[in-house]
């Protein structure tokens, strides 16, 4: 299960960004995940819940996953098509000379911080 390693990497990245921006708590992390990335979302969510609970910045933080559809382009006819539906062979011209345009990526799209109450200025 490589999802745990992926979650650890996401958490390290989020914690680094939080420190750079003086954020003390994270509410939500939105991840864009390619349809053919090889990551199983349910495993990713289970690993996230376990690992986030152990982080000082992330207890209770939600991981939202947006799926990026896999799209392939044919080098012979130039047509684009849905990868999962048609595979590696172009449905337009039956050419095997195709390559994946999108759908393999994994990107942190958004980090939502918990707003902290501003401290009142001290009175003299």
Segments and roles (model prediction):
Residues 1-61:
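Long, charged N-terminal interaction/targeting segments
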Residues 2, 20, 106-124:
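Long, charge-rich boundary regions
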Residues 32-36, 66-70, 109-111:
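Short loop/turn motifs enriched for small/polar and acidic residues
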Residues 58-68, 91-94:
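Short, conserved loop-to-beta-strand elements that form functional interface hotspots
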Residues 62-69, 79-85:
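Short, flexible, mixed-charge glycine/proline-rich loop motifs
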Residues 72, 88, 106:
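Cys/His-enriched microdomains
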Residues 74-77, 90-93:
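Short cysteine-rich clusters marking metal-coordination/redox-active sites
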Residues 82, 95-99:
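Short functional micro-motifs and their immediate structural scaffolds
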């Amino acid at each position: 299960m490589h999802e745990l390693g992926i979650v650890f990497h996401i958490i390290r990245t989020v914690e680094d960004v939080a420190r750079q921006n003086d954020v003390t708590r994270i509410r939500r992390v939105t991840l864009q995940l390619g349809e053919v990335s090889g990551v199983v979302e349910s495993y990713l969510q289970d690993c996230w819940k376990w690992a986030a609970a152990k982080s000082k910045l992330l207890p209770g933080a939600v991981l939202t996953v947006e799926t990026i559809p896999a799209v392939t382009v044919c080098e012979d006819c130039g047509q684009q098509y849905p990868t999962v539906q048609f595979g590696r062979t172009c449905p337009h011209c039956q050419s095997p000379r195709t390559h994946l345009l999108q759908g393999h990526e994994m990107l942190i799209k958004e980090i939502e911080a918990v707003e902290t109450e501003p401290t009142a200025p001290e009175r003299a």
